[in-house]
Amino acid sequence: MDRYAINERTISEAVKGGGLLVVAQWEAKPGQADRIADILSRFLPEAQREPGAQLFLISRAKDNPAQFLFYELFRDEAAFKAHQESAHFKTYIAGEALPLLAKRERAQYALL
């Protein structure tokens, strides 16, 4: 799988109300990229059902499949915190994916 983008909304609909944009970059440890892709394919449908989740886009670099890029738009800071406390985040991300990473960077942005 090269790309994950599952959402019933268009991007323009998702950003209308503003919100908190989280951009993250992951790099898998050697030999772990396909395992991470599998974890993300199970995580994403559950994350997209969160009430405060406006948009999730998760991509895999074409020239380096060990790199993943995330664009996550939440209604507000409270929705982002609820996301991090969700059972699926704790299971798939904290429990399964993070130990397989060589590098993780994350930044938060307010939409203009």
Feature map (PLM): residue ranges:
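Short hydrophobic/aromatic segments of transmembrane alpha-helices and their interfaces
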Residues: 16, 37-38, 62-63, 72-74, ...
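Short, glycine- and small/hydrophobic-rich beta-strand elements in well-ordered beta-sheets
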Residues: 44-69, 109
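Short amphipathic alpha-helical segments
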Residues: 32-55, 88-97
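Residues at secondary-structure transition points
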Residues: 11, 15, 27, 84-87, ...
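Short, well-ordered beta-strand segments in beta-rich or mixed alpha/beta enzyme
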Residues: 20-27, 57-84
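Short, charge-rich amphipathic segments
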Residues: 13-33
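Glycine-rich beta-strand-turn "strand-cap" elements at beta-sheet edges
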Residues: 1-18, 57-64, 93-112
